[in-house]
């Protein structure tokens, strides 16, 4: 524990400096979903440049390198948080029926266990991960099972799934726990504080990435009617819906989108709870 604390103290000043440097760059939003690569100039529904566009400059590329440097240096800490929160994180697989060409559309994302009520597991994810008719999840121990879409809000990019206890043996249920959550503001978090973004692409908790908090509340470039957390990290496709944790494993938001250069946005925990209450009414 002493060694872990020292790592964070050593990194704290560097994280704050990186945050201040990157925040001075006029970053534009990228689409929350995967799109074409480098040659693409298409925009999202909100006019935001997509992943892989050429909207780059020397300052922005330098900032990206700084994010990568911090991420590499503190990866052991992210790995610890990944293990600490493993029982909360799931993979989300959403796919269509077979179309007239014999094709199935599929998207992969991440999710977080919000509530277990004795008969159902409630999982929070991103609404844009739930566009198709069928959904399955991979639970922390690797068990794959069907899930039902309970609720989907494109206004806040939040969605909720349910998994019936009756599908699962007791030993699988015993390895799943709801994540403890709180608003970052209620925890007294500030610019420069460390975060860990967990992706469950392919398998639960498959990647844990160090992040640094930039702002507690900004207008979401992908949706100007929404306020989100802004942070810097190396998240990638498949991270959407995944949890953003504090270094102590407290869930403060869920990943919604990010640009090519390390700026990321997360739906705040309080918004997720508010939407969950709506779907239960």
Feature-to-residue mapping (PLM):
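Catalytic-histidine neighborhood of serine endopeptidases
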Residues: 88, 108, 114-158, 165-166
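Bacterial N-terminal signal peptides
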Residues: 13-23
